């Protein structure tokens, strides 16, 4: 029940990103069961050639991939704010260069947003890996009042 909602995904990358830890997270975005109609990949300063080549290879296959290039490193906050302003869609999925998304992440989240129009921000629980092995599971509260109560002490979102 995705209702043909269009959405954007943003993926910031900086020079410190390792190719081997980047490839699987990047492909987990590309191979989603519900693909974004716009994937903004933001190069925050110069990036490694092998990462650039991989992205350009996929860009040749998928017309929804757009590259935004900042010549010098501006920092994650700046890059995310710029990316949000450049997105063409109401819904925006934030992705990290080291986070692997389950194949139907976008489908689940877009369906949830379609059914719950009062929702402004949506996150999820996460499983943390260390050396490709289970490290911990981070569960967040789903109760609105608990989220509000946590705001002064911690970020109630795993991915923000």
Placement of each model-derived feature along the sequence:
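Nucleotide-sugar donor-binding/catalytic module of glycosyltransferases
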Residues: 1-160
């Amino acid at each position: 029940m995705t209702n043909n909602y269009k959405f954007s995904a943003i993926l910031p990358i900086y020079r410190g990103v390792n190719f081997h830890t980047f490839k699987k997270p990047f492909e987990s975005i590309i191979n989603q069961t519900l693909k974004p109609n716009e994937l903004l990949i933001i190069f925050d300063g110069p990036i490694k050639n092998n990462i650039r080549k991989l992205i350009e290879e996929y860009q040749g296959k998928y017309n929804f991939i757009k590259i935004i290039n900042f010549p010098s490193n501006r920092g994650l906050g700046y890059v995310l704010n710029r990316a949000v302003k450049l997105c063409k869609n109401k819904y925006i999925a934030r992705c990290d260069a080291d986070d692997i998304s389950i194949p139907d992440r976008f489908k689940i989240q877009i369906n949830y947003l379609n059914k719950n129009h009062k929702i402004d921000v949506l996150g999820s629980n996460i499983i943390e890996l260390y050396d490709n092995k289970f490290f911990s599971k981070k569960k967040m509260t789903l109760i609105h009042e608990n989220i509000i109560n946590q705001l002064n002490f911690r970020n109630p979102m795993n991915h923000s």
